[in-house]
Amino acid sequence: MRGLAVLLLVACFCSVAFGDCENTECPRACPGEYEFDEDGCNTCLCKGCNDAQCRIYCPLGFTTDANGCESFCTCNTRETVCQNVVCSGKRVCNPRSGRCE
């Protein structure tokens, strides 16, 4: 039983010391940097953005400012759907959904 406790302690230490982050590929990129959590893992939020989430559904997503931050409860229109959206990798903003695909 004592060996199991030591093994668990070592496993926990390794997770904290060496980062046990999932291989996170964020669908959207940030014009600047991403925020990282207390373990050093990527949160997929742009640095300086508020992570408050609105409870309404926007078919075209939420408006986005020049820093890559989504507005709080302001839905996109057809005119604003892909403004200020930076997609990662080979993804592009889909004007029908406002999401990087």
Swiss-Prot record:
InterPro entries: Antistasin-like, Endothelin_toxin_CS, Hirudin/antistatin. The lineage of its organism: Eukaryota, Metazoa, Spiralia, Lophotrochozoa, Annelida. GO terms for biological process: regulation of vasoconstriction. The keyword Lipid biosynthesis does not apply. Potent inhibitor of factor Xa. It also inhibits trypsin in a weaker manner. It is found in: Secreted. Its main location: secreted. The keyword Secreted applies. One of its GO terms (cellular component) is extracellular region. Residues 1-19 form the signal peptide. SUPFAM superfamilies: Leech antihemostatic proteins (SSF57262). This is Therostasin. Disulfide bonds: none annotated. Belongs to the protease inhibitor I15 (antistasin) family. Keywords: Protease inhibitor, Repeat, Secreted, Serine protease inhibitor, Signal.
